[in-house]
Amino acid sequence: MLESCRNAQERWGGVHQLIDRWLHERQQLVQAFDALSGIQAPAPNAEELQHFCQLLLDYVSAGHFEVYEQLTAEGKAFGDQRGLELAKQIFPRLEAITESALNFNDRCDNGDCREGACLIAELKVLRQQLHERFELEDCLIEVLHNAHSQSGAEGSAVPV
């Protein structure tokens, strides 16, 4: 998961400051996840779990309230029907994964993730969901980046 995060930063870093910041948050989230998922003890470190949950909330919130809106706005500004159609297809799955992440956070806040075995099982599911989410997000960025690059090559002004 960390390797795909690095690849995303290498591919799209510098394209847009908002995306750069978001990809950095993704990397922090993955690192915190890796630290947390390495737990073998019966009880997780409460501070590590709280830190991870905060990063998770920040990341999914930035995606929904900043990045996805920006990607959609740029797709509209560039007249990128392909990108907008892709977003329309992808957003429901991203929303479902966001809901799952928020539920995980709520369970942790309620103390339902204090058991090591329970947490390990939840992290396994969350890992799969985050991996899928990152792939879907990368696909959206790729489409935007391609439209942006093609429009820039044609000499069009870049709306921001």
From Swiss-Prot:
One example of a Gene Ontology biological process annotation: regulation of DNA-templated transcription
Protein purpose: The promoter for a critical alginate biosynthetic gene, AlgD, encoding GDP-mannose dehydrogenase, is activated only under conditions reminiscent of the cystic fibrosis lung (i.e. under high osmolarity), and at least two regulatory genes, AlgP and AlgQ, have been implicated in this activation process.
Name of the protein in its database record: Transcriptional regulatory protein AlgQ
Species name: Pseudomonas aeruginosa (strain ATCC 15692 / DSM 22644 / CIP 104116 / JCM 14847 / LMG 12228 / 1C / PRS 101 / PAO1)
Tagged with keyword Transcription: yes
Superkingdom of source: Bacteria
Family membership: Belongs to the Rsd/AlgQ family.
Keyword terms, alphabetized: Activator, Alginate biosynthesis, Transcription, Transcription regulation
Disulfides per UniProt: none
UniProt entry tagged with the keyword Chloroplast: no
Gene: algQ
Pfam assignment, any one: Rsd_AlgQ
